[in-house]
Amino acid sequence: STSGSISEPFSLPAAISEQAKQEYGQATDQERRAVRSEGNVRRLQKVFGRMAEGGEVTVAYLGGSITEGYLVNSKQNYAYKTTDWLKELFANDNIRRVNAGLSGTSSTIGLLRVQKDVLDEKPDLVFIEFAVNDANDITSKLMYESLVNRIVNSETAPAVVLIFTVLENGYTCEEHQAKVGEAYGLPMISVNAALSPEMESGALVWSDYAQDEA
């Protein structure tokens, strides 16, 4: 089953320090552009509330080489950095990271792997990243939606965030994957939206963002 978007704005739990709230509120234009949609934040608010209370929370990351951290130090991939940021933001060392990124794999392979590599870990929050590994064909679209459906409706009812990356040549499956996110009311992050203005103006070059085309 899908869930529609809600209108109330996203807010951090009251238990978070004022300093952390101020830091969150000082997002750059680039960071604001990256948020394609806040979606339905109820599950995310619940997870963040547990983090703020110091509870044990499992955050899983499923995707391709960008998630795995191909060509970068293991502490430099976004899964590692995001988990560390959450630990710092919520002053909670009980946040566990499960990095299920695997280079060169699409959402079709992700669907085959998701039970063992993600759902068996009982995640509370799942990030999905397959925008540059999937194809823009009907099979890939169906597999991606099946993967999202499987995770959203899994036993732990995790919060799910979709991440849309982009290749140096502009290739991305963001548009068709975003339609799935809209149908399920999911928060969505767009790397392309974050980077494009700076890339077009020359303020950034691709090597500032990535060591390879992805």
Q: Where are the predicted features?
A:
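Short hydrophobic segments within beta-strands
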Residues: A60-G63, I163
